[in-house]
Amino acid sequence: MAKAPAVGIDLGTTYSCVGVFQHGKVEIIANDQGNRTTPSYVAFTDTDRLIGDAAKNQVAMNPNNTIFDAKRLIGRKFEDATVQADMKHWPFEVVSDGGKPKIKVAYKGEDKTFFPEEVSSMVLTKMKETAEAYLGKTVQNAVITVPAYFNDSQRQATKDAGTISGLNVLRIINEPTAAAIAYGLDKKGSGERNVLIFDLGGGTFDVSILTIEDGIFEVKSTAGDTHLGGEDFDNRMVNHFVQEFKRKYKKDLTTNKRALRRLRTACERAKRTLSSSTQASIEIDSLFEGIDFYTSITRARFEELNADLFRSTMEPVEKSLRDAKMDKSQIHDIVLVGGSTRIPKVQKLLQDFFNGKELNKSINPDEAVAYGAAVQAAILHGDKSEEVQDLLLLDVTPLSLGIETAGGVMTTLIKRNTTIPTKQTQTFTTYSDNQPGVLIQVFEGERAMTKDNNLLGKFELTGIPPAPRGVPQIEVTFDIDANGILNVSAVEKSTNKENKITITNDKGRLSKEEIERMVNEAEKYRNEDEKQKETIQAKNALESYCFNMKSTMEDEKLKDKISDSDKQTILDKCNDTIKWLDSNQLADKEEYEHKQKELEGICNPIITKLYQGAGGMPGGMPGGMPGFPGGAPGAGGAAPGGGAGPTIEEVD
């Protein structure tokens, strides 16, 4: 097996996408359903676990055990206000495990809980397998993207999810940075360009300003709203139709989760239609209490329902310009990323804000991030082709980092939007005479007082020799590596005593053992899924064997070649088996195989007799009889896996 290339994965809130750089260009890889993006959904049922399209398609039937939006939980605490607010909207249950959120579902008849990292790792596994099916090789290395807004613990947790899925995460990069790389390849080498990236996806909204010069990217600023995206637009439409339903039928369909889910699916479809048409119709049979709901919505009404949300996308644009100290006239290019940027009204607002400037839509907005991640993966994995040779990438810290000094003041060492990797050192001293130690508390945030910022971690430096206040010199160093992981160290200059901490968010972070355990569990789930697949194959093989046998027996041409008693024996046995199959849908693989052997034991001698008599029927038997050595003459061998012809599974 040749070394597989590294892949780029856009792990989205609602959809994910995977790309690979090979033969000098990026390929975005379609999944087994032929879709180039895969829903970030995982579902658990009585019999199996579904990931991606299969999970999203059955969400209406199984809302409580279908997990989505894991990205909203990853790297956060249960008490987090945003987590508490989000929980009100989710049909699945979120519980606290030592302050960390876990998602509770029923799987194969028992209650299971999963960390967000585990759920995300399942989606990543799906993306990994999608790439493997396309490349025909085992994929090990990946670059995974996160929103520019993600703090340290969210980045670290995303990296852990990669590890659990069996990937070696080469780097975590910001989504807008990835989009910029995708873009930089097309636009290389024309002086300095300022690019504004407007990324409105299914769940998050990010605006970033980058400067590109001679293949070097520098991120100047980032802003956004972690809670604005396509789903919010869907919600507005859902509420609109719920009200309409109340007016028309005096009934509240929100009491029925499944009805609500079906309505939401229809709304999402209508929204997509409205990006290219000015009207969309919705037809849902027997939506609620037997009522068929047929209605329509115009583009104008959709825009009116979301007017405030669409308008609010301009605020982060203004903020990012302020942060980058630029005027809007200095932006050379505007790049659209994320499926929701296809909405004409959003494009119009943005274009008007930039005084009619053309928007760049050349890159498919759903795929731009994965595209850039794939290029970055190729660079980090040592792709030597000239297409990627000249790219350098400078990422930034999304929030300011510093320590608490006397009076609870936030003293910043690394300002937000500083290009990383970076290292900053500052000297501090003691606050009182003969102070034996100092407590170094590390915070991230933009507020003046640490109580309003986010504590990342703390450590003590002890053993400071007695001295008057203000005399000892304590040198504090902040060092951020290319993945945005922070190391903080403090050294007392006279004794050279040192202590340090790596901020990988101690509390929010999974321990080595937990990751280890999850890696093993992921393996176990994968094996169970595999077993489930094999069982279904065995069942399908048995079923098709029965039906093939029956149709062979009923073939006119064979009338005089086979005795009625033999024919009856086979037909009876086949009918018995089909009956057994109907009442044993959940048998295991061995039982199906045993039944097939039993059936073959009866059929094969009769069939052999038939063939010796017939001297090999022209055209052979339908599909080549599975289980019959080599298939019947003229049939070209048995179908692989004992199944006759293609078997189709998973119906939406």
Swiss-Prot record:
Residues 624-652 are annotated as: Disordered. The keyword Nucleus applies. CDD domains: ASKHA_NBD_HSP70_HSPA1 (cd10233). InterPro entries: ATPase_NBD (IPR043129), Heat_shock_70_CS (IPR018181), HSP70_C_sf (IPR029048), HSP70_peptide-bd_sf (IPR029047), Hsp_70_fam (IPR013126). It holds the Pfam family HSP70. One of its GO terms (molecular function) is ATP-dependent protein folding chaperone. Residues 624-645 have a biased composition (Gly residues). The keyword Nucleus applies. GO terms for cellular component: nucleus. It is found in: Nucleus. It comes from the Eukaryota. PROSITE patterns: HSP70_1, HSP70_2, HSP70_3. Keywords: ATP-binding, Nucleotide-binding, Nucleus, Stress response. NCBIfam families: PRK00290.1. Belongs to the heat shock protein 70 family. This is Heat shock 70 kDa protein cognate 4. It comes from Manduca sexta (Tobacco hawkmoth).
